[in-house]
Amino acid sequence: MTESTPVSDPVYDPIAAFAGQLAALGVRDVVISPGSRSTPLSLAFHTHPALRTHIQLDERSAGFFALGQAKASGRPSVLICTSGTAAANYLPAIVEANHACVPMIVCTADRPPELRGWGAGQTIDQVGMYTTNVRWAADLPVPSDWSEPAARLAATRAYESSVGAGRGPVHLNWPLRK
């Protein structure tokens, strides 16, 4: 009988560490607006046993669903979408969360830096797109260039920024290569 060894994946592992840290901190609800670029994010959160995932095809509806989950539970909800205008559709719910001091952790998938600014479809400048409506924002490194401890640290900062003094939404932009 042979034992199988888990296969390490340089893209998935930091994202899974991020999701696991949020779960360890008390996050329970994740709202996913599916898209191809956000697949690694969606899979990492969906497969974590302590997290409940809710699939919402319409991003605007997803944003308000996550807002309602966070209001009802008092815990941050995670919101995940693909790149481009999908992220723009979250803005109304993020503005509402900002003014109502509702914690949300918004994770937007994006193209890697070398593919930005070329006029490709579903491409907008996502870095800082929610500016004054979030407590903290980060344009993260490409996951394969990132360590699991750094991912856990980013998750902790996102969580603490969302639930700390002046509770509200935070934004993490995830550049993902296909």
Model-derived regions: residue spans:
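N-terminal alpha/beta PP-like core and its mobile active-site loop of ThDP/TPP-dependent enzymes
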Residues: 2-178
